[in-house]
């Protein structure tokens, strides 16, 4: 196993020189110049080891002909070693799939009210109508003075509706003033565009978000963590389908994610209450007698707020030298950063953070555990590209994953890769994975990609007014352009007789690439994920051993602009594999429309000329 791992690692760890080439100016860069913004200077990528620099010696080209099918942890081990990112051991019994939006909300409420020591949250925004959720947080803090709360949101999205109406910021700002020794509220703003700047006012609140967002979705309670792609608003709690994975009693992973949120909080604005002090005092003194509809509490959640830059100096908590989270005053001090020109400092801090946790996880990882977890960060504007650096490794891995050693009687002599995104605009790297010649040229070891996108009606912007109303059609156009490439490469038609007997939507032999659309009456679709089921000697049904779950939509925005966090999870637990299989099957049961050239040419799928022009112009922002 070690020999195979080392040889494959040598092959896939270093083909990144092209990834470090300077990209052409992206649309936000051009728009920034036109709006009078100063484009960001390139960040020098100071990789943690010599093996990750453009000046490294060439990697060995000696690679095994095939990856053994019975080594389930080979992929996470290669990713961790090649990218120098941490890998955690876990038990599948501690991992619970939350199956629906309503159960996601009830799980959040339950964990808020039972948390004893800490709650840490990273989300795009909290819905301005979520007063009940805010009330749960308020009462939990009032009842447990030892409880610490850290919330990180996006500055542009959390303040979008203000000051004309309530917003995420107004909903929560009172918490930091009501519990000053327990609460840190932070709003992250892209280094490209600062809140309330002249440029941001010219561009407008709705379009400011195109320059980059804090997009991570991490919800932590003591040592439990929920990783998902869902935000905290009414649609996500009722009728917007997503994925949610609860990982219980995993202190190292919880500390890693909490420390990550605290690190980014150093480069974020503090959210402060700026309303009536007497109202704040009154609500705090009578909080146990109120509910979320009490008039004074409603007024409090609509109060004024302000943003304050402290460079992280006022944070209550920090990562200690052993990786635990402790009172900031007891931890090694960090230098406060300025409100401007902090990009290189943030990049270095994230690189140091990753290397620190890589070494720590490697030293502390127990040999036991049937599951491995590799967190992958993506902050393109800060030159942190762990998720996209993983894609060439995955491509090499899949091209080497061969069932030939299983013999001619293998029950499942092929690999399936299920990939979905609610916003189907695959970046160049993900397209290269799906369309890879290295993967599809092996007729003896076929890999089948099954893609699921949201139908126009399941797109969250369906029926919107103005420019937003064109977004579903824009995604239809992007799907069509992608499908044209699939057809051009002749990957749309079956070339093997293999049929997935466990697929509820099976229509016969598998094609190298299949594209379907998800649709469910009254619902919108926000799932994103990747599942890999490798070859098997005795198991003919779908049984994913690897999944990717988190906030990334796998598009250009996720790659270049937004702050993303995903978990690459590999398990040898049959129970967890069954759970992942059920997740895929439920997704595919609602993906009844199989896309083909005729469908894209139909009258219902025609995209008007204006939308076509706008889509091509704004494609990096979708």
How would you describe each model-predicted region?
Residues 20, 31, 277, 301, ...:
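Generic alpha-helical secondary structure signal
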Residues 57-96, 101, 292-400:
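Active-site cores of enzymes that catalyze phosphoryl transfer or operate on phosphate-rich substrates
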Residues 104-108, 112, 390-407:
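Structured alpha-helical segments in the cores of large, soluble enzyme domains
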Residues 116-117, 121-124, 421:
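Short acidic, glycine-rich surface-loop motifs adjacent to enzyme active sites
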Residues 2-113, 131-226, 230, 234-272, ...:
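PLD/PLD-like phosphodiesterase catalytic module centered on the HKD motif
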Residues 191-194, 208-357, 367:
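Eukaryotic endomembrane system proteins
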């Amino acid at each position: 196993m070690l020999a195979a791992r080392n040889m494959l690692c040598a092959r896939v760890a270093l083909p990144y020189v092209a990834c470090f080439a300077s990209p052409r100016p992206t649309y936000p860069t051009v728009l920034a110049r036109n709006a009078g913004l100063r484009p960001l200077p390139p960040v020098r990528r100071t990789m943690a080891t010599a093996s990750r620099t453009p000046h490294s010696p060439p990697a060995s080209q000696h690679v095994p002909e095939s990856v053994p099918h019975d080594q389930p942890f080979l992929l996470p081990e290669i990713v961790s070693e090649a990218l120098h990112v941490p890998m955690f051991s876990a038990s599948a019994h501690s991992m619970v799939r939350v199956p629906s939006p309503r159960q996601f909300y009830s799980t959040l409420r339950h964990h808020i009210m039972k948390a004893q020591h800490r709650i840490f949250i990273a989300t795009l925004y909290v819905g301005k109508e979520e007063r009940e959720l805010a009330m749960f947080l308020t009462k939990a803090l009032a009842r447990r003075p030892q409880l610490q709360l850290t919330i990180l949101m996006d500055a542009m999205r959390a303040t979008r509706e203000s000051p004309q109406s309530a917003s995420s910021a107004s909903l929560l700002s009172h918490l930091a003033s009501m519990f000053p020794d327990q609460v840190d509220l932070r709003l992250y703003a892209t280094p490209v565009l600062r809140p309330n700047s002249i440029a941001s006012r010219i561009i407008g609140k709705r379009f400011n978000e195109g320059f980059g967002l804090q997009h991570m979705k991490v919800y932590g309670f003591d040592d439990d963590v929920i990783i998902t792609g869902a935000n905290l608003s009414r649609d996500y709690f009722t009728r917007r389908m997503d994925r949610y994975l609860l990982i219980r009693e995993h202190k190292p992973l919880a500390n890693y994610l909490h420390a990550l949120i605290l690190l980014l909080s150093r480069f974020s604005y503090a959210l402060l209450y700026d309303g009536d002090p007497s109202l704040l005092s009154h609500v705090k003194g009578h909080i146990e007698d109120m509910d979320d509809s009490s008039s004074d509490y409603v007024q409090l959640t609509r109060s004024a707020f302000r943003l304050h830059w402290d460079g992280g100096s006022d944070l209550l908590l920090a990562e200690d030298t052993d990786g635990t989270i402790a009172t900031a005053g007891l931890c090694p001090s960090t230098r406060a950063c300025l409100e401007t020109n902090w990009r290189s400092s943030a990049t270095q801090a994230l690189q140091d953070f990753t290397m620190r946790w890589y070494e720590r996880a490697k030293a502390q990882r127990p040999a036991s555990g049937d599951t491995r977890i590799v967190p992958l960060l993506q902050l393109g504007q800060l030159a942190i590209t762990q998720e996209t650096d993983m894609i060439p490794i995955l491509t090499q891995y899949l091209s080497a994953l061969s069932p030939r050693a299983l013999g001619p009687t293998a029950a499942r002599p092929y690999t399936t890769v299920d990939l979905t995104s609610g916003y189907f605009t695959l970046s160049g790297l993900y397209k290269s994975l799906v369309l890879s010649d290295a993967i599809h040229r092996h007729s003896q070891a076929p890999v089948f990609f099954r893609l699921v996108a949201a139908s126009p009606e399941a797109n969250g912007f369906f029926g919107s007014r103005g420019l937003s109303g064109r977004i579903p059609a824009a995604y239809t156009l992007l799907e069509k352009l992608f499908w044209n490439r699939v057809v051009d490469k002749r990957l749309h038609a079956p070339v093997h007789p293999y049929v997935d007997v466990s697929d509820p939507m099976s229509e016969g032999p598998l094609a190298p690439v299949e594209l379907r659309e998800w649709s469910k009456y009254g619902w919108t679709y926000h799932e994103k994920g990747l599942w890999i089921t490798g070859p098997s000697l005795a198991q003919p049904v779908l049984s994913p051993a690897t999944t990717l779950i988190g906030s990334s939509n796998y598009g250009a925005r996720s790659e270049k602009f937004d702050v993303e966090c995903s978990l690459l999870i590999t398990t040898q637990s049959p129970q967890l594999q069954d759970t992942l299989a059920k997740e895929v099957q439920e997704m595919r049961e609602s993906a009844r429309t199989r896309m083909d050239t005729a469908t894209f040419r139909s009258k219902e799928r025609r995209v008007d000329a204006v939308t076509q022009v706008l889509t091509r112009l704004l494609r990096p922002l979708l």
